[in-house]
């Protein structure tokens, strides 16, 4: 297990991936909540089955996997659906992150989280990355091919700076 855990937090489109990529290039192991969330939602996983049961088969793409843009549109327009999804997936995400931390062979590990949620008692240091709101909106629109209205809806659900 890594001896020193550096937490990295920031809102959507603030540059967490760019920062974690720099650390990874320096040999630091990365435990990323976004990657863990994708892992726990793969076909065959318990969360996958519950998401499909709850949202219906229309939530699947042509390959039979969760259509993340479609799911994102639902959960960021209906707060109760976001709560449902978080309650369902967060325990599995935390478990996946802890496994990655414990398997780490580097002296350091970077724990990449979104904004303000998660266990800070695991971290020896916390880095926060931020960006101007208009930069966040532009980055996410380009990356995810979604509207500014959709990005603003996501930002609105995240804790204030």
Task: State the predicted function of each range.
Residues 35-105:
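ATP-dependent small-molecule kinase phosphotransfer cores
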């Amino acid at each position: 297990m890594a001896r020193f855990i550096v937490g990295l937090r920031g809102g959507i489109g603030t540059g967490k991936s760019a920062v974690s990529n720099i650390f990874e290039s320096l040999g630091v192991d990365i435990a990323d909540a976004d990657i863990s969330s994708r892992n726990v939602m793969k076909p065959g996983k318990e969360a996958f089955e519950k998401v499909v049961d709850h949202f219906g088969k229309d939530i699947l793409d042509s390959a039979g996997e969760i259509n993340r843009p479609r799911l994102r549109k639902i959960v960021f327009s209906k707060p109760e659906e976001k709560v449902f999804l978080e309650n369902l997936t967060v325990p599995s995400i935390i478990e996946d992150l802890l496994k990655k931390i414990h398997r780490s062979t580097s002296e350091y590990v970077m724990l990449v989280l979104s904004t303000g949620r998660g266990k800070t008692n695991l971290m020896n240091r916390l880095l926060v990355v931020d960006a101007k709101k208009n930069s966040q909106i532009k980055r996410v629109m380009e990356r995810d091919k979604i509207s500014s209205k959709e990005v603003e809806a996501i930002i609105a659900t995240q804790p204030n700076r």
